[in-house]
Design a protein with these regions (language model features):
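Bacterial N-terminal signal peptides
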Residues: 6-15
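Sec/Tat signal peptide C-region and signal peptidase I cleavage site
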Residues: 17-23
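Positively charged n-region of N-terminal signal peptides that target proteins for export
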Residues: 1-4
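Short N-proximal segments of mature Sec-exported proteins
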Residues: 24-86
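Short, low-complexity, intrinsically disordered N-terminal segments
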Residues: 16-17, 87
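Short, compact, well-ordered microdomains
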Residues: 85-118
Length: 118
């Protein structure tokens, strides 16, 4: 191996941008979820809408396979956009909680919007 390879690798690793925290808060998700209902969107707004809907879809899918009592029960006829709307409605009433991770705010929002029968 040439002598310069370890130096290049060390420099590359040292200059790499630090990873963002896994989940720093819910504010960004709220911003992204404003776009699915918007008519004309820019490319960036389309990307944000897709990020929102994809995160919610993955979150709901993950919650469906967790053992134990379900924290929420979304009807099968509910669309992803309706789920995003429910999240935005909840976030509008609970702006003080948006410093919490996205998964926490989503679980609380869906627990209120889509409670399970008792």
């Amino acid at each position: 191996m040439p002598k310069w390879v370890p130096i290049v690798l060390a420099l590359a690793l040292a200059s790499a941008a630090p990873l963002e925290a896994a989940d720093v808060g819910s504010t960004e998700l709220v911003r992204q979820c404003k776009y699915p209902r918007q008519g004309k969107r820019t490319i960036d707004e389309n990307a944000d809408a897709l990020q929102c809907l994809s995160y919610i879809d993955g979150f709901v899918a993950g919650a469906s396979i967790v053992a134990g009592p379900r924290p929420f029960c979304i009807p099968a006829t509910t669309t992803l956009v309706q789920e995003a709307d429910a999240y935005l409605a909840w976030a509008g009433k609970h702006a003080d909680t948006l410093t919490q991770p996205r998964y926490v705010s989503l679980q609380r929002a869906f627990g209120e919007a889509f409670p399970c029968p008792k």
